[in-house]
């Protein structure tokens, strides 16, 4: 794989994959960006936006009319104004990054003619109205809400549409399957139609009391006969001399068991004897022989049902009603009346059951009115119905677009399931839909068709940010609509403007509530770039409108065949959320209907083409799909005649002839998620461990020096690029200027005369992430380097040369070591600590606010009562710590004093106070101190002042620095712009004939660079040449230059104005100071580490280097792991990685040796030869010049990086070959010596390089001690947990232990003075102060609580403290 990128030439990965990838992997955060863009539609012109997203919301709520229809408020268009603060400012100030929404509304006032009621337009007013702020998405697919970065997780929910299901025989004791159908709209009432145990069909609306389904049909306008004719065919029985003649139909008579002989009505022959069953084959044969009709006797008619009312034509008397069962009595009466033809219902109790007819029979309602009243009573119990209100209510339930919306998806799904052809735009229910659902349900009961699988991805869809936000905004607008209607009716409509009718608060509040407190709006996991990307690609089944943890059964959580290539079967949390929170697969995308699609290559006549098609789960069900690793020949034909495919609706794996294959996977990694695709040899790991591996990579802390893995999968670059951690060049160009905080590129392509030819990239330096890890970007380029569009020019946290680098490659030995690696513990070498291999920087943020209290304002100051000068040594005059100061637990960061409440003063005291001024005792020290367990360096201080409050010295100094930085930025940008523009101008004018110029220029002389240099640059614009096109270009350039210059200055002034303006602080806060402390955490015993294969452990001991086991060449192992951690866990991938990593390091060492030789001989041939042996004929390496080759060699000297993609990686033979190439034994094992004794270990040991991560479970964050601290108010027991500075819980079992030891006094102490004996605690303290060591325990407070609780239940409990009195003397017997 040739990687011709800027970073790809500096370090080339050897690629082991054999399968060529046809499809480009979609951008990994496309899910978020595309969805929100579709919602806002900023790019579309305001007048011509399509009807979706925000536009659709406004269209659905507007126009709003008042109650008398005398006026109407219409929506015209909306547009966004530029946001008030940019992303960085919002982060710093704790603001929300949002754009004000401006909506143009039109108010139309009508004149209404009182006699005719006709309306004529009286007045039209149009106005722009502010409708609140809409949060904007950052470049990386996140939102900034109140200064913190948040992600809106996409939700998986049941797709709208119709679903058929049964109860699996659980409802009724007989185990009979009860079928049910449910119509789920996007919003509106649910309609359930279900069978009961007696086979009567019922309908329920919104899970309320059930009604016979025929009542629903009556309400829809059908009568009894129509209902029967809709569901049953009519068969005409004709009277003949011998009996009744019945038309013979194969389908009707198949499976028919005869009681009497079956007789051909035309010939009178017996075609089937009594007591036999008519098979399908026999029935077909009879038809072929020409059997037209059968003869039936009278008794065989009994038990059938009439299809129509039988009426006396003269008198109108009804003899029998439609649906009535024929009995002997009825038959006798019909014969008497002389009926020659009987229309009967085609119900044979085998293929067609009498369910609807029975329901009709059981239904009490016989007319539409009765049915409507019944439905009204169910929906609104207790209200007396009128026909009008009942009709309106039924109409609004399913047929009113305001209240009921199937959505386009629901309509499409319904059409597909029921074979209907309603247009997508028809989003309410129709009569036909409901009848079709009932028909399909009855068909299921009759054994026709299949029930739906609700876990099929064709029946679950994804709601992403845009759609969630759309629903939220609609809720806000509907709340607003009510208020608008009321206001329109209550004001003088002729004089008001749209602005006066609208209060945008409900809409803004709905949005704020969604982003602030919705279950799906989550604090972004920003531990490392992978955790960011995974968080954005997450699919949750929880949240509003979704499932709950408790209700979700096993089926919903399980892996489904349709997840293939759409949802990762591996990555999901362990614990109660397992299977409810999933991750999108690498190549998956969400289509416009919200279904997850995955790409396949098309196969034509057994030949695989490069055409890529995205299929959703429903479409895929119709095709046979081969896997990506099926062997193909050079022309793309299958080499085998039978190809293993996933085929049919069940997606079973079956071999199929090559010419019947329809599609083929595009890549082996398309079935797993990003995190799982980063695990090399994933195919050799057990699924449970792979799950842990993919979850733990997200917890890896960015280290001080990132190092890409020797053994990667080729996904590392993609993740680093798409996560936004590493910076990619926006345009091709040359590096113009560079320092640690920014990179300036002069573009050489994509030059637009209207835009600046310079790109400036600002780097983030030592910023704090949401998880307190450190975000720091470092440039990778030098001045003069040429970069292409998309090349990585700066590394971010956990990236190395544009590749994701979550951990470090360390030399591991798999062997026991004195029990220190028992139970997955990890033994580390001191080298790891000394060389800062696993050192990370964490930035802690502390803030303090000075409020205006009732007793007076708090003050931030250096003048703190009762504090030594020593404690104030790090504070400046304003009382704020210096940047660069080293602080430890208990140090003051910001000095603050708070006024104290005091006892009322006597007049004398008041007089003395007035004369001698304030006394110091009325303030208390409430300074911000460093909490326990934190020790580090101050890296940043920010001071925020309320508007109108005087700034202190420190705030002014920070402001000056900031303004200087902005001015420098502006000047630099100006200089680059000048150099760029005047360079281009000189190129255009050079060698032209001058027809005009500045003062002193001779006309018609040639303009050269030398001539130009004589004049100041600002006068170059005065030169003119006789070429109109050229002059037009120069004029356009000048215009652009002036605009850019003006824009620069304006931007600078805006930013300075914002700086000086004062900050928006919470109410009551006068001033706020934020202090950032950088804490350096070295690895230490108790820290959690892990590999990428779910092999996790805790560091048990750090051993001096010389005591660690060493190899024959004297290299000491960095880490010793327990070999028993491998067999039972079945994650063999780690062993393969160890072998391959060792080969990589060995080859790196060889390259290092050739480079050392080069410095002696100045000959690069050996290096080229070595690289050719390792990489084969690699294009990238061939194209490097000597300098680049040397740089590549130096980068590879620690180890040669390789890529072994998942399911298509290095095989055993490849690993052995690599080991041999590196000069190692093919077994991957080595003789190892004991570092303490120097003796050789008996057996050879597996040694190699493994990629280890340090996880975000650091012992420093967990260790905690308390002597005195806060107590719970009610029980008076110490609080629990580190965050509350709580104590250790001495629980029930611990009490048993002390009881078992008989340690009575220790136990008494634990239960009283060390816990909740308030008086005893004080006494103990006093005793200690006195130097006395005796104390007495009292009554624990929790006992008093118990007594109080019992009293509250009406049980009087008294505790008598006196010693038990002697029993009263027994009275003498009389």
UniProtKB/Swiss-Prot annotation:
It is an enzyme of class 2 (transferase). The keyword Coiled coil does not apply. GO terms for biological process: DNA-templated transcription. Keywords: DNA-directed RNA polymerase, Nucleotidyltransferase, Transcription, Transferase. GO terms for cellular component: DNA-directed RNA polymerase complex. PROSITE patterns: RNA_POL_BETA. SUPFAM superfamilies: beta and beta-prime subunits of DNA dependent RNA-polymerase. GO terms for molecular function: DNA binding; DNA-directed RNA polymerase activity; ribonucleoside binding. The keyword Lipid biosynthesis does not apply. Its EC number is 2.7.7.6. It catalyses: RNA(n) + a ribonucleoside 5'-triphosphate = RNA(n+1) + diphosphate. Belongs to the RNA polymerase beta chain family. DNA-dependent RNA polymerase catalyzes the transcription of DNA into RNA using the four ribonucleoside triphosphates as substrates. The RNAP catalytic core consists of 2 alpha, 1 beta, 1 beta' and 1 omega subunit. When a sigma factor is associated with the core the holoenzyme is formed, which can initiate transcription. This is DNA-directed RNA polymerase subunit beta.
